[in-house]
Amino acid sequence: MAITGTIAAIATAIVPQQGSVGIVRVSGSQAIAIAQTLFDAPGKQVWESHRILYGYIRHPQTRQIVDEALLLLMKAPRSYTREDVVEFHCHGGIIAVQQVLQLCLESGARLAQPGEFTLRAFLNGRLDLTQAESIADLVGARSPQAAQTALAGLQGKLAHPIRQLRANCLDILAEIEARIDFEEDLPPLDDEAIISDIENIAAEISQLLATKDKGELLRTGLKVAIVGRPNVGKSSLLNAWSQSDRAIVTDLPGTTRDVVESQLVVGGIPVQVLDTAGIRETSDQVEKIGVERSRQAANTADLVLLTIDAATGWTTGDQEIYEQVKHRPLILVMNKIDLVEKQLITSLEYPENITQIVHTAAAQKQGIDSLETAILEIVQTGKVQAADMDLAINQRQAAALTQAKMSLEQVQATITQQLPLDFWTIDLRGAIQALGEITGEEVTESVLDRIFSRFCIGK
């Protein structure tokens, strides 16, 4: 994949009438020339690398001032892309940054593709592919723990073990190929030692694969649906949990007509909480739509909080809803326990195969900590700490690791079957290639396109 031209893009979020600063980034061989054409730095300011200049951005023909700005100059290779890079730090909003970007394009730059700045950093050797993916994860992080995990990946915490595993495979391959080329000059291979080495590599791959589910939780979060009969306190539960009045709460059944969402973080995991309409038979057409959306939310959720009224106990309505959601991971929330005598709470009946039960008094904001603990237990993560999550692979990396492990298992089978040495090398090369795809040492252009299309244009 070739690097062509000088690229430019807006590097900050564009929000109308918001944001005090907007940045236009330019990278490539013509970046400094474009900056010198557009930027007027008064006085005796020196155009040196890694200095900030103050001045005015002017139209190159009319010399009309477009914006008062700062210019950051970074000469190759000491820049994000390892090319010459300039950044115009303009006033925020839409107009100024769009005008500056347009002047850059008219002066010889082209609009950057999504992720092209990071792609150039990868192609120029500043980042490997795991670090590039970690940048996207860091930008999109939805919790402090997710950001910390992404930062660990950016610092090479994943790349290092992958490179070591690949190097170990290359060492084994070199031993085998040496016997193929110089069989008469070298002692025979120790089959058992090679199998042992391969088993050790496969075991380390398995350890990396075990981080996939935790990584996905940190990246995509957990979707939790609160379901139950009308007026059991679902909206009160959402409000108490989110510490806000996200949902309307009344004593009238059917108040919630649509799905209400709230974004939370539980034990480092981003959680999307869905407060749904009470599920019941109704002739109200609007409420019917809400009930159907409740069922859809329950069927697509990662976890269902089946909420019941402890004051009325388990009803036929609760049983009907339970039959609809029992195939999903489920926590039974016994709400309104403040309305029930303490000695009666433990005698409340419910289906025997429900193993996770939480007692809450949502209107009094009681039981939320117990609910969060139960959620962390049911997703089998425990309290996620940043130190536990230094390694967390994504789906692409997991697929490559799985392929590498399968190839190594095939090498073991080939050795056990006492096939010729040439056969040993075939699957070993497959494992080496799969590991190389993770860091980018062996990767196709289509894979790069797919990875970097996730990025915003200015990154």
From Swiss-Prot:
EC number: 3.6.-.-
Start and end residues of each TrmE-type G domain: 221-380
Cofactor descriptive note: Binds 1 potassium ion per subunit.
List of residues binding GTP: 231-236, 250-256, 275-278
Known cofactor(s): K(+)
Family matches, as InterPro entries: G_TrmE, GTP-bd, GTP-bd_TrmE_N, GTPase_MnmE, MnmE_dom2, MnmE_helical, P-loop_NTPase, Small_GTP-bd
A GO molecular-function descriptor: metal ion binding
Presence of the UniProt keyword Phosphoprotein in the record: no
PROSITE patterns the UniProt entry points to: G_TRME
Subcellular location: Cytoplasm
Residue positions binding Mg(2+): S235, T256
A GO term from the CC aspect: cytosol
Protein residues bound to (6S)-5-formyl-5,6,7,8-tetrahydrofolate: R25, E87, R126, K459
Family: Belongs to the TRAFAC class TrmE-Era-EngA-EngB-Septin-like GTPase superfamily. TrmE GTPase family.
Subunit (UniProt): Homodimer. Heterotetramer of two MnmE and two MnmG subunits.
UniProt xrefs under HAMAP family: GTPase_MnmE
PANTHER family named in the record: TRNA MODIFICATION GTPASE GTPBP3 (PTHR42714), TRNA MODIFICATION GTPASE GTPBP3, MITOCHONDRIAL (PTHR42714:SF2)
UniProt-recorded name of the protein: tRNA modification GTPase MnmE
Organism encoding this protein: Nostoc sp. (strain PCC 7120 / SAG 25.82 / UTEX 2576)
The organism's taxonomic lineage, starting at the top: Bacteria, Bacillati, Cyanobacteriota, Cyanophyceae, Nostocales
